[in-house]
Amino acid sequence: MEHPITVYITADTLISSLGANTRENIKAIREYRSGITRHEAGIISDTSILAATIQPEQWERAKNLGTYTRLEQLFILAIQDILSHSEMNLADEDCGLILSTTKGNIDLLANHPDTPDIRVHLWEMGRRISEYFQAGNRVEVISNACISGVSALIVAKRWIESGRYKKVIVAGGDILSHFITSGFLSFRSISSERCCPYDARRDGLNLGEACGAILLSSKGNDTDIILSGGAISNDANHISGPSRTGDGLYFAIRQAMEEAAVLAEDVSFMNTHGTATVYNDEMESKAIHLAGLETVPVHSLKSYFGHTLGASGVIESIICIHELKENVLFGTLGYEKPGVSMPILVQADHQEIPMKHCIKTASGFGGCNAAIVLTLPAYQKQPSRVQSSVTVHTTATVSIENSCLSMNGETVFSSSAPNFAQFIREAYKNTGGSNMKFYKMDDLCKLGYTAVEYLLKEKNFQPEEIGILLVNAAASLNTDIRHQMIINQEGDHAASPTVFVYTLPNVVAGEICIRHKIQGENTFFIEKEFDADKLEEYARIVMKKGNLKACITGWCNLLMEAVSYTHLR
């Protein structure tokens, strides 16, 4: 038995519509200023839209980074700021870098969707940023929809606890483009007014762009906030709609609190996803009640920053860190009248309250949920000794490549189909599956879905006993190209929600979770090449943390050709 490692947050910074660093952003929030403004038709949308964009003077700071994309410039500025305030060198072997984003450099796809710029690949974005800081191959990219930032913090915490790294910088970022705004407009989820989370008037979200960075370390002092717990779950309900019960988010909150040894009465406040869409906020209110946290103050920061996608979990955690340190709970800007069926404590005004612990949550497309616990060091629970690593073994493998599906090394299905689309339909039919929704999925989802049909045949687990960890190189680029071509040819108004929902790679995990009722951990990593050993190492950590009996792990990649490797453990 080993002594557990405490993970401290020792530095942070954020760039948003409200300012160039944490101090400026905190000042703006204290003054009840929102970064959400009206943008006329043109740069980010074909129509007038309310959004929170980074101001021109911010980009001036990056003028010497002209060979990097706009998003890469933000990442570099944020990481530089962290390094300038810490004794850390990303070239050191015990230092890691994790980037969280939903769409990365997707704005580059607009001009040449038929021949994508290599920088559109998330792994290439990661490589370029890593090269700038001489971080070598110690960079990871997580694209897990709107929980990406919180997921990245959890992954960083676990790598430090495992001894892989002593310090990790987690940086989350996304910028706005026609690609993103057209998709959300197609879902009719964007409000024509400034969003008002949890309010009876709420009718949608506002999008935003930002980049934030946090330094996590195995060493800290008595003023550094501790990342004391974290967990990820899935609704196993719907790929674009939140759970109607809130149970998936509740599972993540419960596990995060258990890891932190925190009870409901210990929690000072919650910072929730709070997008101001009707169904998200309703779901969160139910999860809060399931977790017994209905008497804990709740707030959302979306009416200040907008929904900043892959940056949101990082930048909102930064604000929570400073709320804990300064004994202030910021109000939910614009909140007036309760608008969710399960009563929760939301208010518009800032207030001073005694602080101990904060719970930060996030939810996203694909049914994913995440929760972390942030703790003042004086209230850190005395952790018990950690368990030794769990013993796992591979019980089955499935691979799909070159119109051939094999299981445990033996071919079980092959086809002379002229293309992947026809092959995968035939492979699915061969399982005896009858889910008509299969035929509406994009090809990446069909690939993963079919592989797991074979993998889990005659195997049964309870929803919280099994998780899924996937990796690929192309993310959702096949469907990204399709969405971009639609709006290029017909305009933003032609964007289809049934296409846009599949422009997130983790949705393949969401489809699998729905089919097999998987509500355990689910995370999607982006890598140029599959590192099976590293994924297995992380799967062991996940299984121990979540008390899982099984975890599907593998490579699920589709770009002109299909390659899928999945393993059940």
Spans of model-derived segments:
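Active-site-proximal loop->helix
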Residues: 180
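Short conserved active-site loop signatures built around small residues
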Residues: 149
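Active-site loop/turn elements of alpha/beta-hydrolase fold enzymes
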Residues: 173
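Active-site alpha-helical elements of protease catalytic centers
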Residues: 152-153, 215
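Conserved "HGTGT" condensation-loop signature of ketosynthase/thiolase-family condensing enzymes
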Residues: 1-139, 144, 158-161, 177, ...
